[in-house]
UniProtKB/Swiss-Prot annotation:
It is found in: Cytoplasm. Catalyzes the S-adenosylmethionine monomethyl esterification of trans-aconitate. The gene is tam. Belongs to the methyltransferase superfamily. Tam family. HAMAP family: Tran_acon_Me_trans (MF_00560). The keyword Methyltransferase applies. Its EC number is 2.1.1.144. It comes from Mycobacterium tuberculosis (strain ATCC 25618 / H37Rv). Keywords: Cytoplasm, Methyltransferase, S-adenosyl-L-methionine, Transferase. This is Probable trans-aconitate 2-methyltransferase. GO terms for cellular component: cytoplasm.
Length: 261
């Protein structure tokens, strides 16, 4: 179960990639803007400001996130983004930190391009940090008893979930899109007693929490702390540097043909 409040604890750090992603969409006016994986809706509101007058459509798989979005005035729907189909007036599709949960997201991107009208835009940001020490520590601990039996079928994400920037660039170029693809590793300066644990509690540890009792969950967290502290030791000033790689792709549907590319 996703907890909007836990997820938003690091909103200042998590919001920046969204703004950098959307800033590269080169469309001044839009009829319909879609936020796939809208979360608690705090960033969806920015889309309404960026494209005033547009219909804002939002979707998330978590009922808790959709409820939080509704509290912010967002008319969000609970659903699976794999089932989403664009309406004819869709001009912009944004998916920020969601597609890594969908193993077949490459096929999904190609399908969206095929279903959207020329001149539409797709903007996607995907975390690409699944081989980092934080994820490796979670997987290693989950393989130990008493957790292994409870979590043996969790599809923990690994590096292969997210491909290289060149892969996505070629994938979208082959569909006739004009593309802008890049990656960035953010060096987040976190504070708090166990900041990396707190960060991943709002994201990577969500499927773990769903499998464990309250007592087992607290035990898992306590056993994870020394693993994370070894990988991300606090600095003398009390802060912790947390590197986080993210991949961005912005595509104008049919743009390559119109620009002669």
């Amino acid at each position: 179960m996703w907890d909007p409040d836990v997820y938003l604890a690091f909103s200042g750090h998590r919001n920046r990639p969204f703004y950098e992603l959307v800033s590269r969409v080169g469309l001044e006016r839009a009829r319909r803007v879609v936020d796939l994986g809208c979360g608690p809706g705090h960033l969806t509101r920015y889309l309404a400001r960026r494209w005033p007058g547009a219909v804002i459509e939002a979707l998330d798989s978590s009922p808790e996130m959709v409820a939080a979005a509704a509290e912010r005035g967002i008319d969000a729907t609970t659903g699976d983004l794999r089932d989403w189909k664009p309406k004819p007036d869709t001009d912009v599709v944004v998916s920020n930190a969601a597609l890594h949960w969908v193993p077949e997201h490459s096929d999904l991107l190609v399908r969206w391009v095929d279903e959207l009208a020329p001149g539409s835009w797709i903007a996607v940001q995907i975390p690409g940090n699944f081989e980092t020490p934080s994820h490796a520590a979670v997987r290693a601990l989950a393989r130990r008893e008493p957790y292994a039996k409870l979590m043996r079928d969790i599809p923990f994400r690994v590096g292969a979930v997210v491909q290289s920037p060149a892969y996505y660039a070629e994938l979208l170029m082959d569909t006739g899109c004009k593309v802008d693809v890049w990656e960035t590793t953010y060096l987040h300066q976190l504070t708090g007693e166990h900041p990396v644990l707190d960060w991943i509690t709002g994201s990577a540890l969500v499927p773990v929490r769903e499998r464990l009792s309250d007592e087992s969950w607290q035990q898992f967290r306590q056993e994870l702390i020394p693993l994370l502290n070894d990988a991300y030791p606090p600095r003398a000033d009390g802060s912790t540097i947390f590197p986080f790689r993210r991949l961005f792709m912005v595509a104008e549907v049919g743009g390559a043909r119109r620009s002669g590319g």
